[in-house]
Structure formats: C-alpha cells, structure tokens
Regions:
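Repeat-based scaffolding regions
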Residues: 1-130
Length: 130
C-alpha cells in the first residue's frame, strides 16, 4: 500500500502534467505539511513563476533557501537566493541574506555538501594505436 506522501506526490505530478497549476500548488502545500522538504518550496516557486506571480515565487525561493541554510546546505541556499535575485535584482533584502550566509560560513563549509562520485565511463570508441 502506498504511503500518503506517495499518493499526494502522484497527484502533484498529475496536476503538473495537465498544467493544472493551482491544483498542483494546493497538493504541494499538503505534501509540504507532511514532509518539510525545501525542494517542495522550490517547486511551488517554479509553479508560481509559471502563473506570473513573481513576488510569491520569490517568497517561496527565500523560504526554501532559509530551510536549506538551517539544514546546513549552504550552497543550495545560496543557489535559491540567486534564483530569487534573478527575479528581483534590486532586492536589498535578498542581497543581505546572501551576504549574511556567506559571512557566517567559512569557505570549507561552503564546499561540504556531498558530491556523488561516479567512476569515469570506459571509452568504447577509441582507436588503438600500435
């Protein structure tokens, strides 16, 4: 039996596939109430952008950035701040949040997020030289 989280996520995907943006936002809000994943806020911001609700999208991106920062994902938080800043380049609040995050975090901590290692794929179309 599927979990309630999975069921709601499937409903979200159905609404997104049909371009039912408002219904998708409603379901994503329900999903966020169950599981406070910052990526859900990012997706809500994306949908709000599609609806030309720039100010609401910025607020979603800022909320996601704050959640990422609280959890220690500084690089992801900075990326969300940059996304919000792209929508409103003159917003001093966003700039100050970014600067505070940078100042409170040493360079080593900015690079702490795990990077998935994948070994290089073998070259299959190489020509052997003798």
């Amino acid at each position: 039996m599927a979990s309630i989280r999975t069921i709601i996520a499937e409903k979200v995907q159905e609404h997104l596939n049909r371009a039912n943006w408002k219904e998708a936002i409603t379901e994503m809000e329900r999903l966020f109430a169950i599981h406070q994943d910052p990526l859900i806020r990012v997706r809500i911001g994306d949908v709000r952008r599609k609806l030309n609700r720039k100010d609401e999208a910025i607020q979603e991106y800022l909320l996601a950035a704050d959640l990422f920062a609280e959890r220690g994902f500084v690089v992801k938080a900075l990326a969300q701040y940059r996304l919000a800043l792209r929508l409103d380049p003159t917003n001093a609040d966003i700039r100050s949040r970014m600067e505070r995050l940078r100042l409170n975090c040493p360079v080593e901590k900015l690079k702490r997020e795990p990077v998935e290692y994948r070994p290089p794929e073998p070259i299959t179309d190489a020509i052997l030289l003798y």
